[in-house]
């Protein structure tokens, strides 16, 4: 990812204003999309921990978790209430992952939405042996979150941290993907909260970017996202292959691409 991409500003005010309406339409599209979603790859009881976005709670991830449960996964919310940021939640994350590992009897997959994805990615990077797979949804993993449209709200919760956060994201290795953990970043160019340029994963042999047509709020109720998440959770880490969208969903979801923009793995 280039320095220019990291320095982009927040999405347009129009995209932000349309978020609720677009998310409602995405939720309404789940029913007509159900025949396609019924073909999504099934799990075999794998444990999946789902982390919500900023100021959201487990209630926001219920639709996605119910769908994944219906496809044979064993999902769990994080049980920490509202996600009010790293200052309050950060110290609790390691214990959260440890409890999930205890329930599963081994490593688990992580799915994180927005800020939850940043937290999940940090867990995967710090504790790679405890994480099987990582999927982020519209998460600012490729640049400073001060460039998102919700930073003003975040600044009220944790005031005066802009300079500190920007400096931290300029540190060498801060944006590096987890080592040895397959990582899929799902993003939308029409995200009204997080600039799409910083919602993409860094280049690596186990990283990919999957583009969907979605609002930020709608990422948790979008048929294309549901299918892609189920597919990525079903993909074996060895050998790991990048995502290919089913024909009937190619209007709302793109093929997975290597994080450096290269083509999808032709062997799949």
Report the location of each language-model feature:
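Phosphate-binding glycine-rich loops and adjacent basic patches that engage nucleotide phosphates
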Residues: 22-31, 51-60, 184-196
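Serine-dependent carboxylesterase/thioesterase catalytic core
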Residues: 46-59, 63, 69-180, 186, ...
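Flexible, membrane-associating and regulatory peripheral segments of lipid-active enzymes
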Residues: 1-48, 61, 66, 71, ...
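A general boundary/transition motif marking the beginning of the first structured unit of a protein
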Residues: 5, 9-12, 174, 217, ...
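C-terminal catalytic-base region of ester-bond hydrolases, centering on the histidine
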Residues: 179-268
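Short, flexible segments with low predicted structural confidence
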Residues: 39-40, 89-90, 200-201
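Generic secondary-structure transition motif, activating predominantly at the C-termini of alpha-helices
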Residues: 22-35, 97, 101, 154-161, ...
């Amino acid at each position: 990812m280039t320095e220019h991409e990291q320095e982009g500003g927040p999405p347009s005010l129009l995209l932000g204003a349309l978020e609720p309406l677009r998310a409602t339409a995405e939720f309404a599209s789940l029913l007509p999309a159900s025949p396609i979603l019924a073909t999504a790859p099934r799990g075999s009881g794998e444990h999946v921990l789902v982390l919500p976005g900023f100021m959201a709670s487990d209630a926001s991830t219920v639709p996605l978790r119910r769908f994944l449960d219906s496809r044979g996964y064993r999902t769990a919310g994080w049980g920490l209430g509202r996600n009010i940021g790293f200052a309050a939640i950060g110290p609790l994350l390691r214990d959260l992952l440890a409890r999930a590992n205890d329930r599963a009897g081994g490593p688990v997959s992580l799915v994180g939405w927005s800020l939850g994805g940043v937290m999940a990615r940090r867990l995967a990077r710090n504790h790679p042996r405890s994480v099987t797979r990582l999927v982020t949804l519209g998460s600012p993993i490729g640049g400073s979150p001060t460039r998102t449209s919700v930073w003003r709200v975040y600044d009220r919760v944790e005031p005066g941290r802009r300079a500190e956060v920007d400096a931290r994201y300029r540190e060498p290795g801060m944006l590096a993907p987890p080592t040895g953990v397959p990582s899929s970043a799902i993003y939308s160019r029409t995200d009204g909260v997080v600039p799409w340029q910083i919602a993409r994963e860094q280049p690596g042999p186990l990283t990919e970017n999957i583009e969907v047509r979605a609002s930020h709020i709608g990422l948790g109720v979008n048929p294309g996202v549901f299918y892609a998440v189920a597919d990525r959770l079903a993909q074996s880490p060895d050998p790991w292959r990048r995502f290919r969208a089913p024909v009937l969903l190619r209007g709302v979801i793109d093929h997975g691409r290597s994080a450096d923009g290269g083509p999808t793995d032709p062997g799949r």
